[in-house]
Amino acid sequence: MSAALAAAVQPSAPASAQTADRLSHLKRLEAEAIHIFRETVAETENPVMLYSIGKDSSVLLHLALKAFAPGRLPFPLLHVDTTWKFREMIAFRDARAKELGLDLLVHTNPDGLARGVGPVSHGSEVHTDVMKTQALRQALDKHKFDAAFGGARRDEEASRAKERIISLRTAQHRWDPKRQRAEPWHLYNLKKKRGESLRVFPLSNWTELDIWLYIEQENIPIVPLYFAQERPVVEREGQLIMVDDERLPLEPGETPQQRLVRFRTLGCYPLTGAVESDAATLPEIIGETLAARTSERQGRVIDKDGAGAMERKKQEGYF
């Protein structure tokens, strides 16, 4: 048991009891997620798993492999590629797909690509709508998927906190918060009308701390960007933006500085801020998570696109 894990529990309880409680908590979350995977596959015709390459996707993939072991995954993975992911993320994606023999689908909005839509040229709102939301809807329609697994968690953000594990979407992939279904006693309603689809979130009840403890317990590979390292960054509007390639134009007088940083959350690189940190190991990251007083999504620029931005995006078909 790591020192960070020991610090997470009350010191008054015996160490053995503390470990048992924490592990049983993770085992309960694991069992719930595996049940959701199996139930969805049994009740839908053509499911897919959305794979965004981050820590939650890595845990989600690990759970899916456990749910259907020793067989192959009964569904493909879908990565919506905005062309603005960190280079280390794409390298990690390709390496994991090859290592595990995954059926990986990669989709980029061809219209957005032709128009050159990006976060620098068009801003975060247009980029997110065209290269993420519209691209996702295109891919789901193209392959006729009727259920999509995602790694969203309720503790991340307000609109995600009120979304059900099984989230009904219209034929246009829109989410209506008023049409949510009750889910008592882990009973899930996967029925839908023709043309409707489902978004399924097996990690809904996990916290950021749970994710890191499970990654440590299961030794799950993750993108190196989560670990502290000297990286070239510029500071803009309170965010440390990593200069990942030449596409990020520098402002007058701006010079990238090497700073010891890591990422708590990963997205398109100009829209994702790093945090100053010296946490270079999983126990150190867990310790930082325990001490954190801000959301991991504080570094997501898209969450600052006006009040209710995330809920509005979800209603339009976002993850």
Curated annotation (Swiss-Prot):
PANTHER family: SULFATE ADENYLYLTRANSFERASE SUBUNIT 2. One of its GO terms (molecular function) is ATP binding. Pfam families: PAPS_reduct. Belongs to the PAPS reductase family. CysD subfamily. SUPFAM superfamilies: Adenine nucleotide alpha hydrolases-like. Keywords: ATP-binding, Nucleotide-binding, Nucleotidyltransferase, Transferase. It comes from Methylobacterium radiotolerans (strain ATCC 27329 / DSM 1819 / JCM 2831 / NBRC 15690 / NCIMB 10815 / 0-1). GO terms for biological process: hydrogen sulfide biosynthetic process; sulfate assimilation. Pathway: Sulfur metabolism; hydrogen sulfide biosynthesis; sulfite from sulfate: step 1/3. This is Sulfate adenylyltransferase subunit 2. The lineage of its organism: Bacteria, Pseudomonadati, Pseudomonadota, Alphaproteobacteria, Hyphomicrobiales. CDD domains: Sulfate_adenylyltransferase_2. It catalyses: sulfate + ATP + H(+) = adenosine 5'-phosphosulfate + diphosphate. It comes from the Bacteria. It is an enzyme of class 2 (transferase). The keyword Phosphoprotein does not apply. With CysN forms the ATP sulfurylase (ATPS) that catalyzes the adenylation of sulfate producing adenosine 5'-phosphosulfate (APS) and diphosphate, the first enzymatic step in sulfur assimilation pathway. APS synthesis involves the formation of a high-energy phosphoric-sulfuric acid anhydride bond driven by GTP hydrolysis by CysN coupled to ATP hydrolysis by CysD. InterPro entries: PAPS_reduct_dom (IPR002500), Rossmann-like_a/b/a_fold (IPR014729), SO4_adenylTrfase_ssu (IPR011784), Sulfate_adenylyltrnsfr_sub2 (IPR050128). Coiled coil: none annotated. Gene3D superfamilies: HUPs. Its EC number is 2.7.7.4. Heterodimer composed of CysD, the smaller subunit, and CysN. The gene is cysD.
